[in-house]
Amino acid sequence: MNPYSTSPLESHHRQLGVDITDRAGWRLPDRYSSLEAEIAAVQQHVGMADLSAKGKLNLKGAFLPKFLDRVLQIQSYLPGNLTSVEFNHQKILLAALTSDEALLLTPPGQEGPVMDFLSQNLGESFVSFVDCTGGLAGLLLAGPHSRSTIAKFCALSVHPHDFPNFHVAQTSFAKVRATILRRDLGSLPAFELYFDRSYAQYLWETLLDAGQEFSLQPLGCQTVDLLLKGATEKSND
């Protein structure tokens, strides 16, 4: 029995000779280039990373807003908005898709504890949960040219006035049904895409090709960790 969960992009990462590291039971690329080169690329151009290891829970129910208010103290549930919540000293992110459906994103390996907590506090809320961590792949695009790269394939406008920070939408992306959310990393615009894992390699290669004009650089776990840490520290200042 394989003790690790695998990203749908693992074979692609290995073909490029990337060092693979274990993160919360997932095998993920440690880095594609030097840490300094990846940081410089995302600060000056655009970087792309594999987010497939993130926990992903689909929540549905007519009483979902009331349930989330009671259990996670999310008092303002608005479709199209993202809400950051602390759980066990870690940040989880709620993406309100519709009035009765949401996608809950957790750090790798935390989807189980979060789902257990929600189930234990379900009561008579008539809300259902589905762990879709293994069924959905995820990609991060961050940097000054991330918006231009995304706009090449997105059916909706990602202009800042139309799609500001902490917003989410379901749309067609390169002819693939996807959930796109914007969560900037400090001053860097950043977008996350979630979609059926069967399209992971297609979208990765499509974005790599389209991003050449913007000097797109694949990012490893080390760089993503530093970016997230820096964004968290700035938000706490």
Describe every region a protein language model picked out.
Residues 1-237:
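Basic, glycine/lysine-rich polyanion-binding surfaces/domains
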